Amino acid sequence: MHFVECTVNRFYESNSMIHRSVLVGSALLLATAALAASPIADRQAVMKSFGGATKPLAAMLKGEKPFSLDDVKKSLATYAEGNAKFVTLFPKGSEKGENTEASPKIWSDAAGFKAANEKFKTEVAAAQASIKDEASFKATIPALLKNCGACHESYRVKD
């Protein structure tokens, strides 16, 4: 028995750096997995950021808030940032759970969903390039927001 203990101890001592590396790597992997949110939570966070970005735009359109080019730029940047990863947040298997409002049509009409996202991406980029003042804002933003609403009509289920 003593021989086995000595052999095991020598093995661990001689390979302690390897064992530490494996242990640290495993701990990092587990921590990363634990911190990673679900696709449903991730896409809900993106949609929440879109909602926050839309509020000042809608308020400016209604005359409830003075026009601010800085606020417009911030909102459009939020749209662009969220849209860049949005379509990746709908993997198969994330159709149900966690109070999702995602319509099954997202998966049955994946090409249409991706096309709607591409259209939004294009409209956001065009708005970023063209909005320079209140007049160009009022000429551009209503169509962009209408596109958001159309996507919600097609690809969102409200309880």
Where are these regions (language model features)?
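Aromatic (phenylalanine/tyrosine) cluster motif
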Residues: 3, 11-12
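Bacterial N-terminal signal peptides that target proteins for export
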Residues: 12-24
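Sec/Tat signal peptide C-region and signal peptidase I cleavage site
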Residues: 30-37
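Extracytoplasmic c-type cytochrome modules immediately beyond a signal peptide or single-pass transmembrane anchor
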Residues: 37-142
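The canonical Cys-X-X-Cys-His
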Residues: 144-155
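Short Cys/His-rich "knuckle" micro-motifs
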Residues: 159
